Amino acid sequence: MEGLFHLHSDYSFDGKLSLEKLKEECVRRKQNFMVVTEHAEDFDAEKLKRYLAQCKSLTDRDFIVVPGLEFRLEGEMEVHVLVIGTETLCRAEAPRDVMEKMLSGECSGLAVLAHPSRNGHYIPKDLEHRIHGIEIWNAAYDSRYLPDYWAIRLFMSLRKLNRNLVGFGGLDLHDRSGFRELKLQMRHPCRKEAELLTHLKAGRFSIRGPYAGIDSVPDWGFAKMLLLNVGRKLLAGANILKWKLAPPAKSA
């Protein structure tokens, strides 16, 4: 069983595809679920109801649509947290209440630190024990080929404080070009959202890219981390060379 994590539909201001189109694209790619994480600031209570209802209507025996919201937390440095699960979202009277209920332990969903490579791998102290996961591989910011070296370092450091922490791989998809061959491969089949969330929270999956994969709870030693660091540097060098050989066309 496979699925895609961290997708945005046109419920978000920067999403280009409808939920129906996202599902069609996922099914065409032989995926069994998608975890949608819309920007929370785009929602009021009424829009949240419509969103949850549509996710439910698109879920069937062969495909699960898991709703979520992406929250922007401002402080010393802005971080984004993905809050995932229908039960969590339904129990909030307004979208702004979702984060508080999630992190207080009132709900059974997932809270995942999104794309840490975007914000210098910073995490507020008060989140270290309260989140369930870290997006250690974000295809939009880290490439589809390799996970982020420093995100994995952050994960392994925080897991010493939070033994239930799980690593996730997400697309951060906003349009068709965002389908970057990065998926979650579950160890057990799931028929319902609650069952899928239980397995995700427990880390019963691996993260697979087109050429490399990583367990949801990486505990890498020196050799693997060195290889990843070298691989990231080679990838960066290849991107620079590609840009020099074929620089982007100048706009008229």
Where are these regions (language model features)?
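Hydrophobic beta-strand scaffold residues
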Residues: 65, 109-111, 167
